[in-house]
Amino acid sequence: MASAIPYLPPFHCHDIPLHSIGVHSFEALTLSVFQEIWGSGSPLLVTDVRRCFKFQWNPEYFIENYGDKECFIVDPQTDYSKKVTVRDFFTEFGNYAGRGTTFSGNSKKAWKLKDWPLSAAFQEEFPELFEDFSNAVPMPSYIRKDGVLNIAAHFPMNAVAPDLGPKMYNAMASDQTLGSKGTMRLHMDIADAVNVMTYATDCPDGSPGCAAWDLFRPKDLGKLQRFLKERLPKSCLDPVYSQQVYLDEHMQ
């Protein structure tokens, strides 16, 4: 578990249609560049963000500071959830040998701790991490909860503002083999989202850990829905909005 700073892996398959996205370092991203890309509705990848954080945001940190707190973790393959301590979950983080296999026997179980904390506000539950996150994000005028250009910061004081986070998402490594449900199913965000990868455990072969994202352009939503409906059971709900579909290697 020595790899605390994620790296950018090469594209895993050149047969998959790819659309270029903007890639900028934290230092090189200017307001005008961001506004042009964001205004077009395109995804943007910003590198070197992790180096802007003060805290480690790794398993050891959460075990030391929140180990006794209880939380619910979920098995994405079955949606089975159970209550454990934060220490229990993060102790197994990166432990491939002791995780057991899924019902198909094809892959290791990949427990996830999603949207943590579930009920309390992040700012109240983790004030030091909230401050660390707020001070580290790129384009703070847009992204910070109190950013002057963040529309969510301007709700009337007597109104109930939506909870737009931040939230933490922690998941053990999964794979894309046939039948896998990964750790994040296909879905559509209800608002623009900022995702910061703060930690990745090394893979069993020693290579750096990473997170794989499949992003689709909004204008391709109809094509994606038709493609999936042709390949899924007729009784299946909307393949995007139901959040029940995972794009395994066969679907890709």
Please give the residue ranges for each predicted region.
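Active-site region of the double-stranded beta-helix
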Residues: 2-40, 50-252
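Basic nucleic-acid-binding interfaces
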Residues: 46
